[in-house]
Amino acid sequence: MKTTSEIRQSFLDFFHSKGHTVVPSSSLVPENDPTLLFTNAGMNQFKDVFLGLEKRPYTRATTAQRCVRAGGKHNDLENVGYTARHHTFFEMMGNFSFGDYFKHDAIQFGWEYLTSPQWLGLPKEKLYVTVYETDDEAYDIWNKIVGVPTDHIIRIGDNKGAPYASDNFWAMGDTGPCGPCTEIFYDHGETFWGGLPGSPEEDGDRYIEVWNIVFMQFNRLADGTMEKLPKPSVDTGMGLERMTAVMQHVNSNYETDIFQTLIKEVAGLLNVTDLDNKSLRVVADHIRACSYLIADGVVPSNEGRGYVLRRIIRRAVRHGNLLGAKEAFFYKLVPTLATVMGHAGEVLTQKQAHIQKTLKAEEEQFARTLERGLALLEDALTKVENNTLSGEVAFKLYDTYGFPLDLTADVCREREITIDEAGFEAEMTAQRERAKASSNFGADYNNVIKVEGQTDFIGYDNLAAQATIVGLFSNGKAVDTIQSGESAVIILDQTPFYAEMGGQVGDSGLISTEICNFAVNDTQKYGQVFGHIGQLTSGSLSIGDKVTATVDATRRVAITANHSATHLLHSALREVLGDHVAQKGSLVSENILRFDFSQPEAISKSQLEEIERIVNRKIRENIQVTIETMDIESAKKKGAMALFGEKYGDVVRVVGMTEFSIELCGGTHVQRTGDIGLFKLVSEGAVAAGIRRVEAVTAETAIEWLHNQQKVLQQSAEFLKADSNSLVEKIQQLQDKAKRTEKELQQLKDKLAAQAGSELVKQANKINGVNVVVQKLENVEVKSLRTMVDDLKNQLESAIVVFGTVADEKVNLIVGVTKDLSSKVNAGELVGAMAQQVGGKGGGRADMAMAGGSEPQNLDNALKFAEEWIQAKL
């Protein structure tokens, strides 16, 4: 039996023998293609070759391309673990012809590789092929040259509601290269349900697509016209995991060698004996996607690719939690994965330490909120109406506890509860609107603003200047005039306004004439011009008008102090933590400064105190801030540090504060460090694996922050009737007392529950020899129901327990069944039937299930129904 690695290598060897160049897999992060979130097909790295924009030294290529489908248009995440073939990560084997061979060779290559005893040796009678309905050429090649009988060839027409919209017609987009395709299907046999491609039962598991050849022979124009390409090309794909399942005679990809190795590794780590547990599948799949994404440079974050990675990690951690994980485990799978992936695992071996460190940090970070978030979700699920979790709750889990929507959906899916996704999106939209409300200007002008020439920035030495309007933009387009009340972007020939760059926010202020006032809320750079973003509050303005541009001086001074303090902070971090500290991002505003930097571990309190002391010492030294312009090589020799993400020309601006801090910087700065006044760190934490963030305030804001802290301290002391100097001791005393009280209360609850349980044991009925407890309970908290059910099951050893209770006019139902009886009486089935009696829905596992309802007056009938239902089953 061939292993996955052997099949991968045999594919590459076969096509190499046919004159193809073996091209390494490209990164999962697409290069120079903003349309793609992740590499999701073998042809991605050759897109420009197919479009004629790039030439390669070969016309035939073959690859084993790693791909991810999670997030964006191609998102398989919610199905992973629950189906036989959905994955977040997969390998796509491919062979490509760039104007070289076409249909004859492409079809014969595929058939030879699949059926020749020298290669895969699949039985020919097990294979079926599809062709586009009008592609007679491909049909004839299959039938007359390859010899596939007509009853094994299926024509597929336009089955997606439009011309050329078909499972057997591929297009790169609405316009551009496109063409028919032919697919090969493997028949798993009559023991599996499913029909041939094109039949109503085509989605079954019997006939599985294993090969797809796209014939790029047309160029579709905007009017729908199909032009023949001068050099037709071929793009072939074979899913490695699917083919491995075929070759290893299993119907699920999760039964193949790689997944079985990973599943057993997870089970061993977490002491799981049931190897069919779907959570094992989820973890085994997700470690592949996460490891390769990190190896290709993706870092967990809250946006873009980083957020997709974070979602996958958190879903894996949650399923680990279901499997009983008590501590970080996910990162421990990396060495096994690197080994079992064979040659494709070399990149994992090279970056193993980094991958493991990143995974462990993210797992531990999420573990701190997972338990609290799950508790909130469990509570919310007991109160759902119409079997739907509100979008508001789902958003709170996302926003407060870091639960991606698909993780919440996972939990709900297990209870047969849906999520109000429209409500979730409404909450998300509202948050986005709040975030951008301060700008009063929502249009994206990056691709709209086109003005000849450039804006001369004169704001280092001037906060006001005369200027001429050379461009006006409003409502997403260029205009000649704006009227009072309109939001707009004004372009000036020269300006004292600093445009957002290098982490420093853009200036605000006023653009005016004798009769007009334009309030500038922000300043952004568009190419070589500065855009002054805001609203005209009086009069009208037109292109060519002479205006006075005045920066908000108070705000600029505060921003300037924070920028200079950021430079001091950077140097202090390197002095205390080491030279590995490198800037990864920053924000310099009037209210706060934020600095992201490389640092593999948390910073201790003593280190933070030392960093703060160093910065304030440099402020007290009142160092002269020097600004010089020089060529880039001279700046490097001077020891100047470059800012993260900035591009520099041949001539640069160097900001120095003696030898302590020398940086390349285009921002605004104080004249002397003493102008900063005071520096106070206010927060420190991780933003991603290996990246920390500190936030600080300066000058008047720092003094105000200290005043507020003092006020809180004094108010706390007064509230606790203690002196501020002994406040910590007083709080410790109260905490100790609270713990004792809580312990006593829990002991009392346990005692009462035990007494109630003993009484309920006595009241157990025998139905056909089985202990059955069906009771309506009073004054019992919902969260205590599960504990009581478990206690009764343990005491009775073999029993069926049904409880109903009413709280806040809502019915809560719970059913527990011991393992020996769950095959006869399914708890999820019973609680679902009961829920219908009380106007609700619910479900769960065979041994434990909960439901809710909105008709408490029908609870007695529901409990009576339960007794009759159980009796019928027994």
Swiss-Prot record:
What biological process terms from GO does the record include?
A: alanyl-tRNA aminoacylation; negative regulation of DNA-templated transcription
Gene Ontology MF term list: alanine-tRNA ligase activity; aminoacyl-tRNA deacylase activity; ATP binding; tRNA binding; zinc ion binding
A GO cellular component annotated for this chain's UniProt record is: cytosol
Cofactors needed by this protein, per the record, are: Zn(2+)
Q: Function, please?
A: Catalyzes the attachment of alanine to tRNA(Ala) in a two-step reaction: alanine is first activated by ATP to form Ala-AMP and then transferred to the acceptor end of tRNA(Ala). Also edits incorrectly charged Ser-tRNA(Ala) and Gly-tRNA(Ala) via its editing domain.
Record: residues binding Zn(2+): 563, 567, 665, 669
Which gene underlies this protein? alaS
* Family of the protein in this entry: Belongs to the class-II aminoacyl-tRNA synthetase family.
Q: What is known of its domains?
A: Consists of three domains; the N-terminal catalytic domain, the editing domain and the C-terminal C-Ala domain. The editing domain removes incorrectly charged amino acids, while the C-Ala domain, along with tRNA(Ala), serves as a bridge to cooperatively bring together the editing and aminoacylation centers thus stimulating deacylation of misacylated tRNAs.
Cofactor binding annotation: Binds 1 zinc ion per subunit.
Q: Where in the cell is it found?
A: Cytoplasm
Q: What is this protein called?
A: Alanine--tRNA ligase
Q: Which UniProt keywords apply?
A: Aminoacyl-tRNA synthetase, ATP-binding, Cytoplasm, Ligase, Metal-binding, Nucleotide-binding, Protein biosynthesis, RNA-binding, tRNA-binding, Zinc
Pfam families for the chain: DHHA1, tRNA-synt_2c, tRNA_SAD
* EC numbers: 6.1.1.7
The catalysed reaction is: tRNA(Ala) + L-alanine + ATP = L-alanyl-tRNA(Ala) + AMP + diphosphate
